[in-house]
Each structure stands twice: as C-alpha cells, then as structure tokens.
Amino acid sequence: VPPSAASGGDKKTFIPVEMPWQEMLGKVSFWTIWIIFVFGGMAGLTVIGNIARFGLDVLQSASVTETAAKAAAGTAMAWYAIFNGLGRIVWGKILDVVGSKMALFMLFFVQGLLMLTLYKMGVTAVMLAVYASAIGFNYGGTFALFPAATAQLFGAKNVGSNYPFVFTAYGIGGIVGPLLAGFIR
C-alpha cells in the first residue's frame, strides 16, 4: 500500500510518500491504523492488568487451590512477558515478508480470536499459560508493526513526528481496555 506506484514505461517505479503530521491526520489510513492500535492496546493492557485476577477466578472455579491458582497466574504472566519480546522480533520479520497491511490483519485476526476464547479456553494452568503466551506474542508484535506501518504509509522522513500521533491510540486503549474488562467482569 505505502509507496505509490507510478508508471515508467514497462517498469513500475515507486515514489515514496513523505507526509507531515498535519497532512497525515486528514487521511483515512491514519485513522484506520489509529483505531486498530486502540484495540491492540486494549487487548494487551487488559491482559497485563487482569491476568492474575482472571487466573485466580477461572482456576479456582475449576477447583484449583488458591495457592496453585496464584502460582499458575504468576507463571502465565512470566510466559506473557517472554513471548511479548519474541513477538516483536517475529512479527517484524512477518511484516518484511508480507507487508504492513497483511501483517496487521493477521496479527489482529489472531488476537481477536484469542481474546474471544480466553475465558473458555484458559481453564487449566497449562492453557492459561498458553493463552497468555499467545496474547503476549501478538501484543509484542504491535510494537514492531505500527512504527513500520507509519513509515510505510506516511514516509520515513517524518516518522519521528508522525508516529507519536499514532501512538496516542495506545494511551486510549490503556484507559478504555482495563476499565471495560473490569466492567464486563
């Protein structure tokens, strides 16, 4: 999507888009990735903020002792952190192979499925750790994909002034997600 193709005889040459933030804010593509980032931030920060309580609730309702449930929730959070770092590396490579649009679609499709099924699937210590790892892996990917997508869509020249506007979505997701999760609980 990013660089616009211009016809040059039989060959296609790519003209990089270099857009200042004032112009970027008026683009549908900016608001699209901004909204996607809000939901990505909501998912990741909701899990960070609630995994311990969630683990305790779900595992204790499955007759796991409080001590074992606390240990499982702490272990799940550790796996979340490890896979978060790994996700940044792997999703960056995926973006290099398939491009930002497809990588973002893939990441958030998987993340959506994980978030929708977490409550039903994370009912054992092992499954809680597996889900926390997968969600952490995808959440880590957001931090590789969004800066690159910003550069691809709006130009590398202004990414330093453009990306902070994209990153405001993370703050909104960080406020709304945990509040929504607490309300739904």
Where are the predicted features?
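Juxtamembrane intracellular "pre-TM" segments in multi-pass secondary transporters
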Residues: 2-30
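Intracellular juxtamembrane helix-capping segments at the cytosolic ends
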Residues: 51, 141-154
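Hydrophobic core of transmembrane alpha-helices in multi-pass small-molecule transporters
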Residues: 38, 127-141
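Cytoplasmic membrane-interface "Motif A"-like loop-to-helix N-cap segments
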Residues: 96-108
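A late C-terminal transmembrane helix in Major Facilitator Superfamily
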Residues: 139, 153-185
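C-terminal ends and interior cores of transmembrane alpha-helices
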Residues: 109-123
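Extracytoplasmic gate region of multi-pass secondary transporters
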Residues: 22-92, 177-181
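Transmembrane alpha-helical cores of Major Facilitator Superfamily
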Residues: 38, 78-82, 109, 133, ...
